[in-house]
Amino acid sequence: VVKDSRGIEAVKGLDLTVRHGEVVGIAGVDGNGQSELIQALSGLRAIESGSIQLDGKDITKLPTRQRTEGGLGHIPEDRHKHGLVLQMGLDENIGIQTYYKEPLSKNGFLNKKAFVDLAERLIEEFDVRTPSPTVAAGALSGGNQQKAIIAREIDRDPSLLIAAQPTRGLDVGAIEYIHKRLIDQRNKGKAVLLMSFELDEILNVADRIAVMYEGRIVDVLDTKETNETELGLLMAGSTREQARAKEQEAL
């Protein structure tokens, strides 16, 4: 159970498993608990009851850094609020989660060259368009900001990558690139949880789709066995049987 900012239960009695080597998409109309679920999984929101397991370990009460160190990657829904410090350099943003580890830090001192070296490698690998690795993150386009976040998260080789609205507001080229990177993670045997309000994105990227309605997962379907019409009906509160009966009536 997870409450929203008003203290109202936004996630209720939810049970979901994401396996290695698959992308699970969370589909639902905005406001049905998806954002609160992602925040709870990533450590940005407390849960009232229940548990969160990552590779068999209970991470329910762990702070965000320890979840990250335990193998959780997170592409946040709001890249400006939770993904980047816009006034800081791109290199600093890329190293922000591992700044206390070698080679970025040694004996309590930061190694500026190591930050730049890391940023240059990821800029090249993830095609981040920037005039300099030290330019302020806020000076980049939305697509390049998102690529930088994805580069930072994937470079840590997380066991589970949570991607919340990863392509919102981006152009077609950036969208295709990000989809490819998510699928690459799946193909490497990683678990990927994708939350999106765009049904075509869910259908194009996910292997299984969990539909949320009023804070609960009402159904989980194989992507190959469903379609946009059925998902839309489930998102509006219909059962699978009701949705398929309505589809038959429409034929």
Describe each PLM feature range:
Residues 1-251:
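Glycine-rich phosphate-binding loops of nucleotide-dependent enzymes
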